[in-house]
């Protein structure tokens, strides 16, 4: 799934062409603290790329198992899902998302655009900068970053959101919205979770490579559907949609769980629904 680095081959080709050192562009120095291994790419469905250090002028596609380093910037494709195991926390990236791990002795992350779900036990284990603000806490948090606005939804635990000199604490089941240049809004309840999933506890069977139709009771203008491992709460693929129904193709054989969450007009995301079951069979 990943492409091998091409820097050595490129250097040899330039040397063979007789390019003198004086004619070559200077190499940007590596930032202090960059390149330190901090985790691995635990899962990738579709495209996730990393900007290559030190100049970050080119991107390389990653594969599950690849090492992650301080100074890295990641971006996902339009339908991609990726899970980063950073040791101190797990970050699940949604589609069209960009995230950076700064080259710093203080481990943190920066969400530049898109959706990230961060999970880490303990107090203040999660540290992330987004827009003009910063979020700290422990538990499970969903952040959505769009132009000029950030939404934060606490699914578990508690988090402090700070921007424009003001700090707001959100606890499980609460969220806040931050407009760039302004303090966080007062904590508000998250939207209600969708319900009445079909298929539900009785699984639907679908042939591998054929789409399965998923339906639910909508509770907000936008929804996110996730396919999960049968035993673990690990998202394998996800799709953003308006309302039901949604037809998705499962590219692997096996039995999976699925669930759906809702997002209101401000971008606050609900807790996930209960799960339904889907079986993808080869024939």
Q: Model-found features: residue ranges?
A:
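Short strand-edge motifs at loop-to-beta-strand transitions and within beta-strands
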Residues: 244-246
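Surface-exposed, short loops/turns at beta-strand junctions within beta-sandwich domains
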Residues: 248-255
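Extracellular fibronectin type III
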Residues: 267-278
């Amino acid at each position: 799934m990943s492409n091998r680095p091409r820097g050595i081959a490129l250097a040899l080709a330039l040397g063979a062409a007789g390019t003198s050192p004086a004619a070559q562009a200077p190499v940007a120095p590596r930032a202090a603290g960059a390149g330190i291994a901090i985790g691995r790419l635990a899962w990738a469905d579709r495209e996730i790329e990393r900007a290559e250090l030190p100049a970050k002028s080119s991107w390389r596609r990653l594969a599950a198992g690849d090492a992650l380093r301080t100074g890295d910037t990641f971006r996902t494709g339009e339908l991609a899902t990726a899970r980063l195991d950073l040791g101190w926390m797990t970050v699940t990236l949604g589609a069209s998302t960009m995230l950076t791990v700064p080259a710093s002795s203080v481990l943190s992350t920066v969400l530049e655009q898109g959706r990230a779900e961060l999970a880490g036990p303990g107090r203040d284990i999660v540290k992330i900068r987004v827009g003009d603000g910063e979020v700290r806490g422990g538990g499970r948090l969903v952040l959505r970053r769009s132009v000029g606005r950030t939404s934060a939804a606490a699914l578990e635990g508690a988090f402090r959101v700070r921007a424009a000199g003001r700090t707001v604490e959100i606890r499980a089941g609460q969220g806040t919205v931050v407009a760039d240049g302004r303090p966080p809004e007062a904590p508000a309840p998250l939207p209600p979770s969708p319900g009445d999933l079909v298929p539900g506890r009785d699984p639907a069977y679908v042939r591998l490579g054929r789409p399965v139709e998923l339906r639910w009771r909508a509770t907000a203008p936008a929804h996110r559907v996730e396919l999960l491992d049968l035993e673990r709460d690990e998202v394998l693929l996800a799709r953003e949609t308006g309302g039901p129904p949604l037809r998705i193709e499962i590219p692997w054989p096996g039995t999976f769980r699925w669930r759906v969450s809702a997002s209101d007009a401000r971008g606050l995301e609900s807790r996930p629904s209960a799960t339904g079951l889907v079986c993808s069979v080869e024939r």
